[in-house]
């Protein structure tokens, strides 16, 4: 029936599905569903969205029959011992059934008022008349039993969404018998199915035998899993059995080399995985999280052995990706026509969703009653459990090597190509998401990763991606995950001790993004890149500023040999965060200052002699610290109503007089500028970093003019010439305006074009609702860790001043003096790591992020064609789906909830002072 005439007849037949109310089951249109189409695009062409919606809205009985016919034919093919057989059980028929289900189900999910129907149709127990047939021929007359049973369900038993119990039916009145899918394993909640037989007396004392079947969705999911491990369909013909639990690719759980997968087998796997992804996609069509029976059954109730083999297959297939067009991965060129790309995308998305799923209490109660379990019986995610139990070193080596290869490919391409036209892009962001889950759910793997030679390279690559996409709203969720990973790894002492090594790729990585920096260590790369991520105006990651600063706190006790460039960034942050205008805007802004002062104090107390540049920078910036120490609420409360930047004429003239020795971070003179403290940011979109215009510590020549700094209001017994070289509120100049300013513009005119402190919006709420009080001020001001900083100022200000006034003396001499000195009355502190706490709301946000990338990949055709979701109303339901995890979507309740959670992270840190709580929190998950 593959000819043109049969296709035209088939097209006329399926048109009747929407126009004719109740098509008989003996009509030839049902059989032609799996025999006529020859490809997936043909199936999608025969069933356009309008036809499916019309059938759903006006001929729903036909749609129910269609689903029953397709699933039953698929079950019959699966049960055929010769499948796949071109004569009796062809694989093409199974593929057509799979394609039709993949096409139709999204349009059922998009209609919200079908929720009760979903529960009755897919999750109600069924009865089947026992038949002696063993072949795969489908007797359509037998479907009347199913339809009668569905009608009895609708008439007699109204399912309430508030009750998680199994709907009552003639079948459910019998005790459910639990049988194990795997005879060799113990019976438990993870490997139990329901079935059995009974004899029901009919009218006239005629006895017929019926089987108590599993629900239709359970049977469909079991069939899908069987087809994923079917000889000749998704497994090589050399497999010993028709359905064999064989891991698809070499890697975790395999000791023997697996046979290479042919393109035909790969395409069949893609088709089945596409259906599996559609079956668990109801979350896309709901504005909030819903209880998913499907995901819970797949992750918690399915057969243990199958779960284990499928988990290993998903991981190995995802990480074994070696596309033919990989050479172009550093650019935006992604190989769309490579079947391995689609297979890897599908396996990675399903893997992430399975590992992340936490069963909803409603679903847990449903399956407890469904499986006759005790009320307190545990139903947990088996994928997460088995992954957490990985412990073989060979498995860890495979994970680390393959993750490093995939993450480092775009990064290594930067140094491999002389001319980089575009910024390097990551073609597989799901790899970063999987890395986060790996270190979150397997503590032994995290320890192995930290001790591996690739540990610092992992940290560099992840931080680089956060820096790369800091202004890309589409990848804002990815940046958050990157920052979480870096923060989580920064809590490990073994890794922190490695961060003082020279970072070989730092200059090439930063230059690829337009930053000019000198050679630096891994620790300096983290500090400078963190500065460029957070210290930007209107940053979408302002709520993550506590995470970023606490990452610096974690590595601070181990940092050595900080350069002047890095110290300048720390001093800029300190100057911005200590501004009264910033501190009194919000009742929680002081937390950022506390975290930064903790980091600086930790460096001073633990590595004073190894960081003379930082000590010198503190002395240069001493006025900020002295003012902060002597700050009083009555004296500064009025700054709340004053402009953030206020320079008088005297300050302006002094501002201009110091422009002659202005240099950039790399020591090169700045051309056509007569200002020194101007930052470069964006005007209308995400703002860029405070860049090279803001550092006075560029070279010995520019640092030698310490004695020329004017004296202003120093209220401590130190030389008045040691004056702050930073403004309390650094000025910011938009990138758009930078190229339009005339060469000889005055500073007063330039100030008018400058914006305010880039931290001005961090953690901000309505400032009109907050009135600072003495109790609030004293509660945090007394906790500021200024003792070690003030000790440096008190002990070394005069010696440094005298050293700088000596003839032929340079800044290097002063730095050498500090390096050979000992800080009195200051003792090292024990490192106190702050750990990130992953909670259930964060799980929900992570799941939405995974679906965000799923939709993005599907829209681009990266998960095979045709698209799975673009023709359904998932986009219209969410508005622009790319805004689900976007920080600018103020109308999205999910993102608002996520931002609220992230804004409160600082409170979590205050409640978690030691690593003991961290370990206990992991055990309680």
Swiss-Prot record:
Record key words, sorted: Cytoplasm, Golgi apparatus
Biased amino acid composition, Low complexity: 650-664
Subcellular location field: Cytoplasm; Golgi apparatus
InterPro entries reported for this sequence: Hid-1/Ecm30 (IPR026705)
UniProt cross-references to Pfam families, sorted A to Z: Hid1 (PF12722)
Stretches for region Disordered: 650-671
Function, in words: Required for the localization of ubp5 to the Golgi apparatus. Involved in detoxification of cadmium ion.
Similarity section: Belongs to the hid-1 family.
Subunit structure, as described in the record: Interacts with ubp5.
Protein name: Ubp5-interacting protein ftp105
Taxonomic placement: Eukaryota, Fungi, Dikarya, Ascomycota, Taphrinomycotina
Gene that encodes the chain: ftp105
């Amino acid at each position: 029936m593959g000819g043109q005439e049969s296709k035209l007849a088939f097209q006329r037949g399926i048109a009747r599905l929407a126009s004719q109310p109740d098509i008989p089951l003996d009509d030839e249109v049902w059989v032609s569903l799996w025999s006529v189409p020859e490809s997936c695009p043909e199936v999608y062409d025969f069933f356009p969205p309008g036809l499916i919606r019309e059938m759903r809205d006006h001929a729903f009985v036909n749609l129910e029959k269609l689903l029953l016919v397709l699933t039953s034919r698929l079950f019959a093919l699966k049960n055929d011992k010769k499948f796949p057989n071109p004569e009796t059980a062809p694989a093409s028929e199974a593929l057509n059934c799979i394609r039709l289900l993949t096409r139709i189900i999204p349009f059922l999910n998009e209609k919200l008022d079908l929720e009760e129907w979903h529960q009755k149709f897919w999750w109600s127990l069924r009865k089947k008349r026992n038949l002696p047939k063993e072949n795969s021929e489908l007797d359509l007359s037998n479907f009347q039993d199913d339809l009668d049973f569905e009608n009895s369900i609708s008439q007699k038993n109204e399912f309430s969404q508030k009750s998680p119990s199994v709907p009552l039916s003639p079948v459910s009145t019998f005790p459910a018998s639990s049988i194990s899918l795997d005879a060799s394993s113990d019976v438990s909640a993870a490997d139990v199915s329901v079935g059995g037989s009974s004899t029901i007396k009919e009218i006239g004392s005629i006895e017929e035998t019926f089987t108590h079947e599993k629900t239709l969705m359970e049977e469909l999911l079991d069939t899908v899993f069987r087809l994923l491990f079917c000889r000749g369909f998704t497994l090589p013909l050399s497999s010993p059995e028709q359905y064999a639990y064989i891991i698809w690719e070499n890697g975790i759980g395999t000791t023997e080399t697996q046979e290479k997968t042919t393109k035909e087998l790969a395409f069949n796997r893609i088709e089945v995985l596409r259906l599996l992804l559609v079956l668990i996609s109801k979350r896309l069509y709901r504005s909030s999280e819903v209880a998913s029976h499907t995901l819970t059954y797949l992750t918690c109730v399915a057969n243990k052995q199958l779960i284990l083999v499928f988990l290993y297959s998903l991981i190995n297939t995802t990480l074994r990706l070696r596309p033919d067009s990989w050479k172009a991965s550093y650019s935006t060129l992604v190989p769309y026509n490579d079947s391995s790309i689609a297979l890897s995308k599908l396996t990675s998305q399903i893997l992430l969703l399975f590992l992340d799923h936490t069963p909803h209490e409603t679903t847990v109660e449903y399956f407890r009653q469904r499986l006759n379990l005790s009320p307190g019986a545990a139903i947990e995610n088996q994928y997460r459990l088995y992954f957490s139990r990985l412990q073989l070193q060979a498995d860890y080596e495979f994970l680390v090597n393959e993750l490093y290869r995939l993450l480092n490919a775009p990064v290594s391409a930067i140094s491999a190509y002389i001319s980089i036209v575009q910024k390097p892009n990551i073609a597989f962001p799901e790899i970063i998401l999987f890395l986060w889950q790996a270190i979150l759910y397997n503590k032994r793997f995290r320890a192995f990763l930290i001790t591996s030679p690739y540990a610092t390279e992992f940290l560099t690559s992840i931080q680089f991606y956060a820096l790369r996409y800091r202004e890309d709203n589409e990848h804002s969720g990815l940046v958050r995950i990157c920052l979480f990973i870096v923060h989580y790894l920064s809590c490990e002492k073994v890794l922190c001790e490695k961060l003082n090594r020279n970072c070989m790729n730092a200059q090439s990585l930063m230059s690829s993004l337009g930053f000019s920096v000198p050679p630096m260590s891994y620790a300096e790369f983290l500090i400078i890149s963190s500065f460029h991520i957070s210290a930007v105006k209107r940053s979408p990651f302002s709520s993550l500023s506590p995470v970023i600063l606490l990452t610096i706190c974690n590595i601070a006790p181990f940092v050595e040999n900080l350069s002047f460039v890095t110290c300048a960034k720390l001093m800029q942050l300190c100057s911005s965060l200590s501004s009264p205008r910033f501190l009194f805007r919000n009742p929680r802004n002081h937390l950022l200052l506390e975290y930064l002062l903790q980091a600086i104090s930790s460096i001073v107390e633990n590595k004073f002699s190894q960081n003379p540049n930082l000590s010198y920078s503190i002395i240069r910036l001493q006025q900020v610290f002295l003012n902060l120490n002597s700050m009083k609420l009555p004296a500064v409360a009025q700054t709340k109503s004053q402009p953030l930047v206020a320079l008088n004429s005297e300050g302006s003239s002094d501002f201009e007089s110091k422009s002659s020795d202005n240099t950039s971070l790399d020591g090169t003179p700045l051309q056509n500028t007569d200002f020194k403290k101007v930052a470069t940011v964006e005007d209308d979109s995400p703002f860029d970093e405070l860049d090279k215009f803001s550092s006075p510590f560029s070279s010995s020549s520019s640092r030698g003019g310490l004695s020329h700094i004017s004296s202003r209001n120093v209220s401590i017994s130190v030389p008045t010439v040691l004056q702050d070289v930073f403004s309390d509120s650094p000025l910011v100049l938009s990138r758009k305006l930078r190229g339009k300013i005339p060469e000889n513009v005055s500073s007063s005119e330039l100030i008018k074009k400058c914006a305010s402190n880039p931290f001005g919006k961090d953690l901000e709420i309505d400032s009109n609702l907050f009135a600072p009080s003495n109790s609030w001020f004293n509660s945090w001001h007394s906790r500021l860790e200024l003792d070690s900083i003030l000790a440096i100022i008190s002990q070394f200000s005069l010696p440094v001043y005298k050293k700088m006034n000596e003839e032929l003396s340079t800044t290097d001499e002063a730095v050498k003096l500090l390096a050979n000195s000992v800080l009195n009355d200051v003792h090292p502190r024990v490192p106190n790591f702050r750990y990130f706490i992953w909670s259930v709301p964060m799980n929900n946000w992570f799941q939405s992020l995974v679906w965000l990338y799923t939709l993005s990949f599907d829209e681009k055709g990266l998960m095979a064609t045709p698209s799975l979701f673009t023709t359904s109303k998932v986009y219209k339901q969410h508005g622009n789906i790319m805004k689900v995890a976007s920080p600018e979507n103020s109308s999205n309740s999910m993102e608002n909830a996520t931002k609220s959670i992230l804004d409160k992270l600082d409170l979590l840190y205050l409640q978690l002072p030691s690593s003991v709580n961290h370990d206990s929190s992991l055990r309680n998950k």
